[in-house]
Amino acid sequence: MTKVTKEMREQWRIEYEQQKAAEKLIVDTLLAEEEMLDEDGYPTVAAQTVVSLWPWEDKKGWFLFIESIWHLRSWGWHESTEPKEYPKDKTVQRFDISTAGWSGNESLIHAMEKNSFMWATTWVQSRRGGHYIFEIDNDE
């Protein structure tokens, strides 16, 4: 078995920071220069890329961005403050979202899944019919 050295850990940290900086540059450039919806209201490849590369430190911003391009959000997007399962004295921001079967919203869900850290730390539940529940701690 290979022993993990201090130098190896430092190299991994540097590579991680470089990748993170490159992804932030891509997101910032796309947000500044590209259309997020096409002429029919579907999320563009640029929008899906932004969702899949969004930095994990900004969960609230991720949901704000996705909501801004979500089709039928008056019907399929609901936010609420709910008690946290544990500890009970804390609260979470809950996002109940439904795709309404619309392929544009389904493409956003797929882009969200590609952002594996964000998905793993916010996803709570999926149900048949395109219904999803996500939560973020209110202290984030």
Predicted regions and their residues:
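An N-terminal amphipathic alpha-helical segment
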Residues: 21-92
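Amphipathic, interaction-prone secondary-structure segments
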Residues: 77-113
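Short, compact, well-ordered microdomains
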Residues: 102-140
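Generic structural motif recognizing short loop/turn segments at the entrances and edges of beta-strands
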Residues: 61, 89-95, 127-133
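Acidic, low-complexity intrinsically disordered regions
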Residues: 8, 50-52, 58, 66, ...
